[in-house]
């Protein structure tokens, strides 16, 4: 049984809306047992596991921890729910990356990389810039290509289609960034 001084309850944050309660038990230097609160584990594993209700009942007794009337699941208990996930599936759901981070952090006994909202916005801006650059290259290549005689309508339709497609992508990305900026503003206001 772990020493009471070695039990460390904390919260790991991975996104503006993904904060998980964890318990880290330090057995020895560089030897940690990480436990994730059961409801957080259920939310996190929902895209990968259809029967989340069995999460606690099917866990090995050594993977269960009850503290302050809350149930916690050991990091090793999370692995079996990923065994049927197709890692070749693209694109991965956002939870895929969060699960990987949670598992690494629970094994290490500390959160390795905290969520940085500004970094998230920068990443989204870079993705928008790449998308716009692709659109510009495509439009430029079509503009410089000589249209076949009698095909100006086809070229016009192509340009209109490309314009519509990239306008939708830009609108979606802009809305996402605005939502994140609003979340950051809310977080800053809460911290004051």
Swiss-Prot record:
Keyword Cytoplasm: no
Keywords, ordered alphabetically: Capsid protein, Late protein, Virion
Localization: Virion
A GO-annotated cellular component: viral capsid
Spans through the membrane: none
InterPro entries named among the record's database cross-references: Baculo_p24 (IPR007765)
Family: Belongs to the baculoviridae p24 family.
Further comment found in the protein's record: Expressed late in infection.
The protein, known as: Capsid protein p24
Gene that produces this protein: P24
